[in-house]
């Protein structure tokens, strides 16, 4: 989960990373009070999860509270690279800046370790630095057991060739940034720029944080950080039911068990769709191994609630997941939706194979629901689902 700048700033402050004061607001008039709290001057910064805010006009200085209101009025509702600005941060003006640096920690999947990155060339796109002057970007592996103490931080600073007059201050910031990375179960923490001010302070002026959602079970506070405005309502509903769901731009709803099978199903449906009006998969939904009838019912309810879906393909190979449980889930979901007065009109194509497949097929046959069609091969079922979706367009 990627955070907004103001959320990253709050986490930095929580763990001792030096930051400037700031407040997030969502109405122009609130900018007045927030600026007054900061002494009458501020920086108004659009809160979007994309770079290039400054060039897009999403970062403006305000010399007084009235100007802060005007700037907030201009920025709220702005579109920046497809992201609508719903909030702005009213931030304290930085003291005069003498130098800008870059520091970060991230998960290095290739080498199966953590990586510290640091550069004396901050305030710009770090990918550009890595491409044009790779020698200016130090990359230092970090052992997960040892972590980053002040000695390790000094090693990072030395490899990045920070000037002697800021070396200790940057090292101390690196220690607190590592504390943030570990304590918050982050995949990335980045400060760009980390600045040295004329009065000698080291400050984190802007930052990025990406959190590992797999650690949500031990990070209850992270739920409050979710972006409710940007969340797809179907994805939000699926997450609330602990379903692995991703909305796609298509017409055939997909339900399967196991990520590999679901990915294969997407491919097969996309291929079949070429012969049926170029219909495509509408989603990724993995109900997982050992899914119960309740999980199946929850998944089907999400899929049928998608207005883009014209047909549904349920593709299950029973291993830990028993096909009779899947069949019961389908029957229960349809009955539940109809009991709520919801008109279910989207046809379902079901392919069951493996554990208790015959029993699952019998359950569907006995239910004899007019919208459910059984097809016993994956290719045949994909073709039928694509055909039905095309006919309903």
UniProtKB/Swiss-Prot annotation:
It is an enzyme of class 6 (ligase). Substrate binds at residues 257, 319-321. Pfam families: ATP-grasp_2, Ligase_CoA. Succinyl-CoA synthetase functions in the citric acid cycle (TCA), coupling the hydrolysis of succinyl-CoA to the synthesis of either ATP or GTP and thus represents the only step of substrate-level phosphorylation in the TCA. The beta subunit provides nucleotide specificity of the enzyme and binds the substrate succinate, while the binding sites for coenzyme A and phosphate are found in the alpha subunit. GO terms for biological process: succinyl-CoA metabolic process; tricarboxylic acid cycle. InterPro entries: ATP-grasp, ATP-grasp_succ-CoA_synth-type, ATP_grasp_subdomain_1, Succ-CoA_synthase_bsu_CS, SUCC_ACL_C, Succ_CoA_ligase-like_bsu, Succinyl-CoA_synth-like. Heterotetramer of two alpha and two beta subunits. Mg(2+) binds at residues 192, 206. GO terms for molecular function: ATP binding; magnesium ion binding; succinate-CoA ligase (ADP-forming) activity; succinate-CoA ligase (GDP-forming) activity. NCBIfam families: PRK00696.1, sucCoAbeta. Pathway: Carbohydrate metabolism; tricarboxylic acid cycle; succinate from succinyl-CoA (ligase route): step 1/1. One of its GO terms (cellular component) is cytosol. This is Succinate--CoA ligase [ADP-forming] subunit beta. Its EC number is 6.2.1.5. Keywords: ATP-binding, Ligase, Magnesium, Metal-binding, Nucleotide-binding, Tricarboxylic acid cycle. Belongs to the succinate/malate CoA ligase beta subunit family. The keyword ATP-binding applies. It catalyses: succinate + ATP + CoA = succinyl-CoA + ADP + phosphate; GTP + succinate + CoA = succinyl-CoA + GDP + phosphate. SUPFAM superfamilies: Glutathione synthetase ATP-binding domain-like, Succinyl-CoA synthetase domains. Binds 1 Mg(2+) ion per subunit. Residues 9-237 form the ATP-grasp domain. Its cofactor is Mg(2+). ATP binds at residues 45, 52-54, 92, 95, 100. The lineage of its organism: Bacteria, Bacillati, Actinomycetota, Actinomycetes, Kitasatosporales.
């Amino acid at each position: 989960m990627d955070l907004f700048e103001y959320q990253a700033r709050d986490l930095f402050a929580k763990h001792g990373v030096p930051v400037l004061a700031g407040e997030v607001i969502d109405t122009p008039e609130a900018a007045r009070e927030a600026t007054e709290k900061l002494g009458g001057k501020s920086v108004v910064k659009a809160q979007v999860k994309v770079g290039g805010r400054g060039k897009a006009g999403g970062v403006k200085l305000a010399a007084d509270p009235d100007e802060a209101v005007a700037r907030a009025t201009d920025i709220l509702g702005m579109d920046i690279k497809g992201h609508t600005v719903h909030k702005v941060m009213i931030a304290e003006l930085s003291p005069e800046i003498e130098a800008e640096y870059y520091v970060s920690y991230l998960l290095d999947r290739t080498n199966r370790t953590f990586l510290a990155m640091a550069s004396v060339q901050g305030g710009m796109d770090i990918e550009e630095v890595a491409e044009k002057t790779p020698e200016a970007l130090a990359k230092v592996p970090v052992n997960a057991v040892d972590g980053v103490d002040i000695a390790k931080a000094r090693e990072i600073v030395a490899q990045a060739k920070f000037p002697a007059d800021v070396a200790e201050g940057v090292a101390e910031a690196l220690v607190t940034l590592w504390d943030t990375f570990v304590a918050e179960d982050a995949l990335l923490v980045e400060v760009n720029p980390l600045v040295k001010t004329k009065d000698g302070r080291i400050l984190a002026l802007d930052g990025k944080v990406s959190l590992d959602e797999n650690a949500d079970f031990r990070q209850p506070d992270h739920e409050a950080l979710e972006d409710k405005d940007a969340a797809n309502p179907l994805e939000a509903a699926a997450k609330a039911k602990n379903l692995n769901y991703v909305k796609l731009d298509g017409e055939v709803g997909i339900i399967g068990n196991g990520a590999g099978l679901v990915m294969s199903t997407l491919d097969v449906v996309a291929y079949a769709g070429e012969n049926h009006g170029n219909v495509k998969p509408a989603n990724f939904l993995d109900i997982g191994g050992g899914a119960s009838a309740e999980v199946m019912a929850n998944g089907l309810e999400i899929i049928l609630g998608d207005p883009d879906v014209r047909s549904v393909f349920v593709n299950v190979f029973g291993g830990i997941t028993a096909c009779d449980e899947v069949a019961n889930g389908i029957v229960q979901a349809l009955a539940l939706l109809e009991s709520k007065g919801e008109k279910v009109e989207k046809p379902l194509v079901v392919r069951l194979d493996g554990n208790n497949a015959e029993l699952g097929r019998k359950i569907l046959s006995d239910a004899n629901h007019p919208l459910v069609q059984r097809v016993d091969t994956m290719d045949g079922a994909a073709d039928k689902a694509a055909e039905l979706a095309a006919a309903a367009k």
